[in-house]
């Protein structure tokens, strides 16, 4: 939902930063790779129990994920390879983050939360897959409750606020796992109906 409504506004806000990045010689590929490295670093920190720091670093990586596309557009350097790399690193970053969460809760001796983390990451990967498949079939694959922006918000705040004794991690894992699979179902049904 936020992906569709807010992406254009966020891109406009990112324009001045993107122009500066382009002037400094930072291309979209470099920005994508730095964002991915931040996501992996954040995931490792989460696994080690530095939840707020890890979530914050993942958030910084997510901001770079917005910036790379804006830089590509402003500099006329949008390519199919860049789009592939961006999507690929986005998915790897999600897997890394949930692996960090699963490791952390496993270390706490909470097997139910480990299982829910696996369920969450599977759903999180299916959401963009269904969009890509729908678009490959010539129909609209966007929409649903938990787009990338919503998934990041729930993950970052749910993980990060746990460090401040707000007990947000367990509810966030449950909420994420349930809502992401609801989104999978939404996208599947919507695509199915368009193919009639």
Stretches found by the model and what they are:
Residues 50-78, 82:
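Glycine-rich active-site/cofactor-binding loop and its immediate structural neighborhood
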Residues 69-115:
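Basic, amphipathic juxtamembrane/active-site segments
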Residues 65, 86, 124:
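Conserved G/P- and acidic residue-centered "switch" motifs that form tight phosphate/ATP-binding loops
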Residues 1-62, 96-196:
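Hydrophobic alpha-helical transmembrane segments
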């Amino acid at each position: 939902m936020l992906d569709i409504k807010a992406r254009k506004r966020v891109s406009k806000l990112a324009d001045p930063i993107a122009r500066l990045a382009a002037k400094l010689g930072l291309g979209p590929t470099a920005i994508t790779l730095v964002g991915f490295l931040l996501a992996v670093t954040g995931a490792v920190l989460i696994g080690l129990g530095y939840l707020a720091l890890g979530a914050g670093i993942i958030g910084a990586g997510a901001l770079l994920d917005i910036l790379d596309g804006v830089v590509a557009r402003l500099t006329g350097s949008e390519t199919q390879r860049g789009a592939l790399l961006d999507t690929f690193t986005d998915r790897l970053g999600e897997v890394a983050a949930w692996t960090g969460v699963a490791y952390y809760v496993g270390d706490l001796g909470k097997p139910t939360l480990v299982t829910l983390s696996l369920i969450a990451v599977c759903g999180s990967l299916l959401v963009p897959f269904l969009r890509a498949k729908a678009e490959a079939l010539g129909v609209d694959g966007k929409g649903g409750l938990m787009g990338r922006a919503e998934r990041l918000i729930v993950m970052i705040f749910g993980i990060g606020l746990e460090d401040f004794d707000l007990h947000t991690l367990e509810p966030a894992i449950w909420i994420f796992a349930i809502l992401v699979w609801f989104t999978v179902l939404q996208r599947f049904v919507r695509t199915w109906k368009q193919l009639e």
